[in-house]
């Protein structure tokens, strides 16, 4: 009622000014909507928090190439490794919220990093989920000469020999480390963690008998297993990996066990919803392309099309799990 009388008084006092103000307001809304609908009208930068040539970089480039072809603008990869991914994430959060700076991110940056470091941002408030584009699990591998031939035998041996089983990783807080820590925590095993500088180096440590077991990215370990250089005894995914169908899942030994990792696209919070939706829908179409499915399959990755709402559900669910895991693995940030 009050707003209606106020509007009538304004129009009566200066109808031309009131009409111009209304036209200007409608024009701004229309331009914003049209801009989002037309996106992209210029090149789009995809920030990747890893160095060139790694698994995340390769996956991001495969998708960027197809985004370019589908949307008619160049999607350019910008590698910004360092500081555990925070440098890249902060740069995207600071960028204009216009959809022209996106971030290709691993799930661990969302769910484990906040428990390890005192961050300048909150990924749950400062990032906008777009799409999870791929998921994968870890492959448990031991030396080919090891007497261990199954996950049950590994658990029993580690339990009978506390402190004598160690596992390698690419570094603290990475997927390799978390996979080993998750098994040790769940089964109450005393297993040592030995970090190396990279995934290949941590795999080589098992192949050369310097470390007992490795929880490896499928890209590295599947090729080694097929080449007879390492013995794969289990996978952490809920279903067997089609690339190595004879290797059982960890859940076949530990019912309900599922440790799956993912990577996908996010934008800075405040990016227009129409842009988020168009990007998500396009990524979903790309995920179903036969060539994309095969290329990711060859990397040991399942091509997925997980949309923003489900994306948010997943990270919220993982949040408490990784908080507990970070505490048990001694990864919690200083308080």
Regions found by a protein language model. Name each.
Residues 1-12:
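N-terminal secretory signal peptides that target proteins for export/translocation
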Residues 17-30:
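Bacterial N-terminal signal peptides
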Residues 108-118, 182-186, 213-246:
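A ligand-binding cleft/hinge motif common to bilobed small-molecule-binding domains
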């Amino acid at each position: 009622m009050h707003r209606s009388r106020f509007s009538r008084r304004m129009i009566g006092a200066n109808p031309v000014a009131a009409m111009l103000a209304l036209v200007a307001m409608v024009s701004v809304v229309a331009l914003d909507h049209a801009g989002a609908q037309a996106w992209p009208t210029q090149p789009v930068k995809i920030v990747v928090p890893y160095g060139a040539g790694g698994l995340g970089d390769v996956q991001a480039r495969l998708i960027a190439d197809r985004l370019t072809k589908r949307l008619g603008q160049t999607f350019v990869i910008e590698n910004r490794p360092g500081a555990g991914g925070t440098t890249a994430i902060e740069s995207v959060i600071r960028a204009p919220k216009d959809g022209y700076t996106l971030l290709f991110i691993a799930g661990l940056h969302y769910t484990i990093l906040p428990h390890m470091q005192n961050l300048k941002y909150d990924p749950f408030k400062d990032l906008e989920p777009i799409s999870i584009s791929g998921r994968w699990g870890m492959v448990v591998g031991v030396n080919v000469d090891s007497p261990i031939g199954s996950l049950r035998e590994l658990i029993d041996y580690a339990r009978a020999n506390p402190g004598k089983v160690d596992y390698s990783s690419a570094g603290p807080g990475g997927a390799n480390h978390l996979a080993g820590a998750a098994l040790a925590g769940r089964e109450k095993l005393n297993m040592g963690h030995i970090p190396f500088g990279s995934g290949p180096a941590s795999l080589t440590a098992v192949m050369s008998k310097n470390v007992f077991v490795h929880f490896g990215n499928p890209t590295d370990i599947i090729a080694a297993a097929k080449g007879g250089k390492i013995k794969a005894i289990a996978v952490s995914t809920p279903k067997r990996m089609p690339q190595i169908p004879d290797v059982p899942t960890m859940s076949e030994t530990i019912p309900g066990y599922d440790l799956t990792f993912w990577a996908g696209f996010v934008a800075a919070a405040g990016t227009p919803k129409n842009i988020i939706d168009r990007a998500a829908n396009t990524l979903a179409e790309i995920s179903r392309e036969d060539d994309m499915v095969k290329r990711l399959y060859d990397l040991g990755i399942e091509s997925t099309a997980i949309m923003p709402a489900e994306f948010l559900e997943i990270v919220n669910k993982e949040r408490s799990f990784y908080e507990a895991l970070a505490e048990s693995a001694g990864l919690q940030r200083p308080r």
